[in-house]
């Protein structure tokens, strides 16, 4: 975490550490020392669900901000006012809030407000589910959720099976995707937009974060989001999604169309195959690290922090001994190829399905 804080400071970014478990008595030992350590290395904020940890951080005089976690299910301005009185610095609203409620809370201007815009949705109130506790003995409220709601079940009525044995019952919801609401959030004064990153790959995060960043920058430049940019961003995000998405609760109480009652395809439309490690402008040779199987002499798509998604035709690919490769299928292998399109260090390359 200390190394991450140094990196973030050098890139004008912040590090917020989740300390949002609901601690049982046996978990209390070491929390004070942990908070002091986080403070000493300069994290910018902690995200907390337990009032005991919130109060401890304030009592210790920690320099970082204390943000109320979404797991506290804050859904109204009275809750925000309560947390302000307790000295909290920001509230991450419950994912069960509707757009109209978020607007009303922001209009009160009580505390900076943070909302979720992308990622998994709990079938129960966020962070309040105990399915995982019962099914796997893993405590969902202490970082151990096994996502039991996404398992496939035989739905029984006594001895009679109601589910289709070839398409078993599930009880999870579609993931949240709030592209259509980003303009609203910006104009109503939401302080921070939150993307779920727990257990996600670097490729997923790079794709989703860069897509929303593109949309946010467009809105700040033009004052609004038109249909073209909305569809472009949705198309980009879909390249990393492996679950159906929907608006969550933002339109109101979700109906059956945002629930996933049966099996569904979880295949992404594009596959992350390499990352750029180096590039020689004079020879136009790119050095890549292989991540997944791909073939030379095909079209690939590159994207990075400073370059838009661009299709580039890749010709011959060589290993470190300058041998021509017929296939790139060794993860972490370093390969070289002539590159004719835009490129930058750490840009990601994906296969087009």
Question: Which sequence ranges carry the predicted segments?
Answer:
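Conserved phosphotransfer cores of two-component systems
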Residues: 61
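Gly/Gly-Pro- and Ser/Thr-rich, intrinsically disordered tail segments characteristic of DNA damage-repair
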Residues: 66-77
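Alpha-helix capping/helix-boundary segments
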Residues: 52-53
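Non-catalytic, usually N-terminal nucleic-acid engagement modules in DNA/RNA processing proteins
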Residues: 1
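Surface-exposed amphipathic alpha-helical tracts and adjacent flexible/coil segments at the periphery
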Residues: 4-21, 29, 35-39, 65, ...
